Swiss-Prot record:
It comes from Mycobacterium tuberculosis (strain ATCC 25618 / H37Rv). GO terms for cellular component: cytosol. The record marks 138 as: Participates in a stacking interaction with the thymidine ring of dTDP-4-oxo-6-deoxyglucose. This is dTDP-4-dehydrorhamnose 3,5-epimerase. It is an enzyme of class 5 (isomerase).
Length: 202
């Protein structure tokens, strides 16, 4: 596998080596050695999620408070999604910046979203199936949303068939980025680096 850090520090695109023959294909989705090579620590999986979305469904933006937040190792096993990570860590040199990765069932890429970042994705095809390994179990008291179409963030979501994205009631009612910031819920850069540094033993 090859890992490339995105424009948001702490987020990586992972591209596997795919072996194809007459039977089909095989690839290693995750190895401890490969993960440690870019993240500097092992991935302690506490929950595994699967979502199936129709074309045009937008899920996010979601983040969890530190500690322990919730890192995610995300891939699309069927269909395709436009996957987005946003730097919401106050004090970060890239605060407010976003980056994206196309996850699909052709290149089989994965995105790793470390603790303290916001995440969301837009399904580009019907029955787009996303699997994600999570470093912590879901905790509704510490899980929060940010408006995915907030003009302050200006995420360039692609239109699917020219239609506005379909959101859950919760995501549609998500507060703006500035409102979440004013509420004091956003993580701080130093806090996240200290938390991750402890996992790395540094």
């Amino acid at each position: 596998m090859k890992a490339r850090e995105l424009d948001v520090p702490g987020a990586w695109e992972i591209t596997p080596t795919i072996h194809v023959d007459s039977r089909g294909l095989f690839f290693e989705w995750l190895t401890d050695h490969g993960f440690r090579a870019f993240a500097g620590h092992s991935l302690d999986v506490r929950q595994v999620n699967c979502s199936v979305s129709s074309a045009g469904v937008l899920r996010g933006l979601h983040f969890a408070q530190l500690p322990p937040s919730q890192a995610k190792y995300v891939t699309c096993v069927s269909g395709s999604v436009f996957d987005v990570v946003v730097d919401i860590r106050e004090g970060s040199p890239t605060f407010g910046r976003w980056d994206s990765v196309l996850l699909d069932d052709q290149d089989r890429r994965t995105i790793y979203v470390s603790e303290g970042l916001a995440h969301g994705f837009l399904a580009l095809q019907d029955n787009s199936t996303v699997m994600y390994l999570c470093s912590a179990e879901y905790n509704p008291q510490r899980e929060h949303t940010i408006c995915a179409t907030d003009p302050t963030l200006a995420v360039d979501w692609p239109l699917v068939d020219g239609a506005a994205p379909s959101l859950s009631d919760r995501d549609a009612a998500a507060p703006s980025f500035e409102d979440v910031r004013a509420s004091g819920l956003l993580p701080r850069w130093e806090q996240t680096q200290r938390f991750i540094g402890e996992m790395r033993g540094t």
